[in-house]
């Protein structure tokens, strides 16, 4: 029997058997063990979830703002009380170190839910005077039933990022987690129900993106889709959403982000920032700054500091709290990352450290890839142009500010960018010219609930987090009121 047993779908406030009974395995990438069997939803299950959501959403929307706020705050409290339990599940399902999942994944997700719970009473319309006897007022009304489709790298955090503003605005959500990492989304559904969310307001359908995800994007009963994933999948989501019922979409589609280091920096600080921008969560972060631009005069010294730090990484069993670098999320993804590493070698990049899968001792049965650093990279190399989503840093040298800005922007992506410098004028001057939606100066990676996150160009549509996201889960109704006489032309 697997550790977490059979996991059913979560529809209408309760665990529900799938129509087909088909299942798939959840695998711990640290050791290859099956930790759960998950039921796979089909079209009938999607219809059931939509019907449940349509029934529950008006009940939820009819509650006062303070009532909805209290229920979501209660869910925040439960999340924090169960932090360690949820972190252990997340670590087993994703391979992320327990030191990460305990301190980041549930914590930051709960923070976002608390943020939106506090904003609910502030969601309001306007009153617009027209003339003495007439005025217009507006209402922000929920969209109805919306869908969230998550990625595998931050399962519960993404589920909370998508559900928090949707629920706060009075919508119901059907959430499809990645089939690779589905367990904590189901636990979140339990928590919402325990907190008092009406049945049907948050449903979880497990299964493949090609099937369940497509059904959700095409379903006529769904008003909006929020998707996190790759560009190719995002294009399908947008096409399906537009081709069915002109659904609204929000999409975060990854990146190939530049981190620009200038010559005036403290090189130790710059190296620390580059390490976090590349190797946190084993490099499986959409905003990672994997194109590290360094002044040519500092390149050798910078490389030395990076190699020193890579050698200090503690790789191992992610359930060991001393470990800060675990396996990749799956064996399939490990193989994909290794193909990119092999490409870097073939195309002539200089390998400084790593460059291999790790198969010795306790790591033999896991999906481990060594932290890898290439230097003397060119802008046309595959490892520089394509999103790898793994622990692979590419170091590129440059000679002038104008040159590095041009090269940093020479990509179809535009999710994130960063600048490390002690010159405040230069920092803002350069950041303002970088084509990216999320930018950091002298830091990397933090995304507070108040901070809108999303990309330029092919990196996405719309934003998550921040006040504006809450508004995007509503539709504006305008009402004109006439207090005086009405004059007809007929």
UniProtKB/Swiss-Prot annotation:
Entry binding sites for NAD(+): 150-152, 176-179, 230-233, 254, 286, 387
UniProt-listed CDD domains: ALDH_F9_TMBADH (cd07090)
Sites where the protein binds K(+) 1: 93, 180
GO BP annotation list: glycine betaine biosynthetic process from choline
Modified residues (Cysteine sulfenic acid (-SOH)): 286
Catalytic activity: betaine aldehyde + NAD(+) + H2O = glycine betaine + NADH + 2 H(+)
Protein name (record): Betaine aldehyde dehydrogenase
Gene name tied to this protein: betB
